[in-house]
């Protein structure tokens, strides 16, 4: 009798039919789509054979939009309606966008994510990104000849929850099923690791148009373990262009510039930067709207000089990522360069000097992320051949915690924890009869809630009334493979439950992430003192309240002198708790606890006698 083969649920394609899935690199400057054909990943070109799609969208008064090269060509004459580098705005509020006052766009002052005023109406970064994704989806379906079942879309490793959610929302608008959000450095490691059968510790240095990521990975026998991540999602090739634009303006004395002239000179600056990747000098020519002619010669040494601090700025997260991973530059077997901006000779030299080795450049830095994403998409779609499996172990960049009494933070998921991850911890009530609990979800490394970033708040209601400390509330944090967080709280006795999917209105800037981490190191001792003070104050308040309730019900068990002594101890605790010395508060609490031991014993005796009153020996036990 023939044996029937049974595949995992959702992993079995129809006989002789492949499930079409693609990898998409949604970049700041350019975007790409790739797929696996005949077991080989390849970038899918447009009808003109071009692999890259400029991440540019121009909106027209009739509501239509031009995407890609056509929009890029129109950017100079219509700068306000031509949206470039929209990835920098994803999941960001107005206050999070760097140099917003110098932007060419008309921003709308609205709550939540930043909005852009265009000829076709007000557009969000999610809508702009959806136009780019829809174009890539159509390109893939035309090239592959059928509809897609889904896509793996790459994001910077340092994208926070809001930025990741915005990316998923854009994909949904574009009609794409997201199989996975994959960190860009991890995608590059897949492409390199599987191509070269590499093992060991690798660093992925990813400098794109608008973002910078550094990841330290350990590759062993098909397992990709991310040991640490770092970066800055507001630093990229665009910043080198901006620095060069400022140099041009200073050389010619052109202030102020019209929007059209700014965009024209930015285009010339980018072209000059790219030219200097393969030559020692270049000429910048432009005719402004006033008729003024710009003619400058720029040599490589000058460009290196005016952008040197940007190059050095990338090395700060590199040092920290290595420190977090517990390794040094000498332990790194290879350095993978990702992103078009890594073509700059100054970048390659700085990376090579720091790690003491030539970085790996045998794969096109513009394409490597899309190729790795395509391989992961092919795996998730169930098209892989036996032996092509691999395991990704990614991490979260910042700790996740919950606020407890006294404004303290209890960390539930530490930073650099491997995802997906689920962690749970039990908490209890503070007061007798408490029937609700407020859950405050936080992100950061500090000890006090006021120093961390608030992600969400929700309430667990319906807790059965009990004495303080009797209820057991289990709080569970779940971070999925896309890095998105959900939190649930459950009272274990009654089963009452509440949950929230964390969707902040806008994201956490990576300057904030870096600042939060730096502050956590600098303020560690101060934070621990504050935490100890808050903990002792909470314990003091709890003991005073419990003693007060006990005196109300059983105060007649004490003589007048004993009652006066307890009252004095309580007053002493309350007074000392107003101070800043946590050791003094702890000592006062211990004195009150010891001073009420005899009272507690008498209460216990009374309780036992009351419980046994009127019962026969046979009825007990």
UniProtKB/Swiss-Prot annotation:
Q: Does the keyword Nucleotide-binding apply?
A: yes
- Gene Ontology BP annotations: iron-sulfur cluster assembly
Family annotation (Pfam families): HSP70
What Gene Ontology molecular function terms does this protein carry? ATP binding; ATP hydrolysis activity; ATP-dependent protein folding chaperone; unfolded protein binding
What is the similarity comment for this entry?
A: Belongs to the heat shock protein 70 family.
Name the SUPFAM superfamilies on file. Answer: Actin-like ATPase domain, Heat shock protein 70kD (HSP70), C-terminal subdomain, Heat shock protein 70kD (HSP70), peptide-binding domain
Q: What's this chain's function?
A: Chaperone involved in the maturation of iron-sulfur cluster-containing proteins. Has a low intrinsic ATPase activity which is markedly stimulated by HscB.
Q: Which UniProt keywords apply?
A: ATP-binding, Chaperone, Nucleotide-binding
Q: What is this protein called?
A: Chaperone protein HscA homolog
Database matches in CDD domains: ASKHA_NBD_HSP70_HscA
Top-rank taxon = Bacteria
């Amino acid at each position: 009798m023939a044996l029937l083969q049974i595949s995992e649920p959702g992993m079995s394609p129809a006989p002789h039919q492949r499930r079409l899935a693609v990898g998409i690199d949604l970049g700041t400057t350019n975007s790409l789509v790739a797929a696996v054909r005949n077991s080989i990943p390849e970038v899918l070109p447009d009808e003109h054979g071009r692999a890259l799609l400029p991440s540019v969208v121009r909106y027209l008064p009739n509501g239509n939009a031009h995407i890609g090269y056509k929009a890029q060509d129109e950017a100079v004459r219509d700068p306000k309606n031509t949206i470039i580098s929209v990835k920098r705005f994803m999941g960001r509020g107005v206050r999070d966008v760097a140099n917003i006052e110098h932007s060419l766009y008309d921003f709308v002052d609205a709550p939540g994510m930043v909005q852009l005023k265009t000829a076709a109406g007000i557009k969000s970064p999610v809508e702009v990104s959806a136009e780019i994704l829809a174009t890539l989806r159509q390109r893939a379906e035309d090239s592959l000849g059928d509809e897609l079942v889904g896509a793996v879309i790459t994001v910077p490793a340092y994208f926070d929850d809001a930025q990741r959610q915005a990316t998923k929302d854009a994909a949904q608008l574009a009609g794409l099923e997201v199989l996975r959000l994959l960190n860009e450095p991890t995608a590059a490691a897949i492409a390199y690791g599987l191509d070269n059968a590499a093992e060991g510790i690798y660093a992925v240095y990813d400098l794109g148009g608008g973002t910078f990521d550094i990841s330290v990975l350990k590759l062993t026998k098909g397992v990709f373990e991310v040991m640490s991540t770092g970066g800055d999602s507001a630093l990229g090739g665009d910043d080198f262009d901006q620095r060069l634009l400022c140099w041009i303006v200073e050389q010619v004395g052109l202030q102020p510039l019209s929007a059209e002239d700014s965009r024209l000179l930015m285009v010339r600056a980018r072209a000059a930067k790219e030219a200097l990747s393969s030559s020692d000098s270049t000429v910048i020519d432009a005719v402004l709207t006033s008729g003024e002619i710009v003619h400058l010669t720029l040599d490589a040494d000058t460009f290196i000089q005016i952008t040197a601090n940007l190059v050095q700025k990338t090395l700060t997260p590199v040092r920290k990522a290595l420190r977090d991973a517990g390794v040094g530059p000498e332990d790194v077997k290879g350095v993978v360069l990702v992103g078009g901006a890594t073509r700059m000779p100054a970048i390659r030299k700085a990376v090579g000097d720091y790690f003491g080795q030539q970085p790996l450049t045998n794969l096109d830095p513009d394409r490597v992320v899309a190729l790795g994403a395509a391989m992961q998409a092919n795996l998730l779609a169930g098209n892989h051949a036996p032996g092509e499996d691999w395991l990704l172990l990614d991490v979260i960049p910042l700790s996740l915690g919950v606020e407890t009494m006294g404004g303290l933070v209890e960390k539930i998921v530490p930073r650099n924890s491997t995802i997906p991850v689920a962690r749970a911890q039990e908490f209890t009530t503070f007061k007798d009869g408490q029937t609700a609990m407020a859950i405050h979800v936080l992100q950061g490394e500090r000890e006090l809630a006021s120093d961390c970033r608030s992600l969400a708040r929700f309430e667990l209601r319906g807790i059965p009334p009990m004495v303080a400390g009797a209820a057991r509330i289990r709080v569970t944090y779940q971070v999925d493979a896309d890095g998105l967080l959900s939190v649930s709280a459950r009272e274990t006795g009654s089963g009452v439950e509440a949950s929230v999917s964390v969707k902040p209105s806008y994201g956490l800037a990576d300057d904030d992430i870096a600042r939060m981490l730096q502050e956590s190191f600098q303020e560690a001792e101060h934070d621990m003192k504050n935490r100890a003070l808050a903990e002792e104050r909470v314990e003091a308040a709890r003991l005073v309240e419990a003693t007060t309730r006990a005196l109300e019900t059983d105060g007649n068990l004490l003589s007048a002198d004993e009652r006066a002594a307890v009252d004095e101890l309580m007053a002493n605790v309350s007074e000392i708790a107003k101070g800043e010395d946590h050791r003094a508060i702890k000592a006062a609490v211990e004195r009150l606890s010891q001073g009420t031991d005899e009272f507690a014993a008498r209460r216990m005796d009374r309780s036992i006698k009351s419980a046994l009153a009127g019962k026969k020996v046979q009825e007990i036990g």
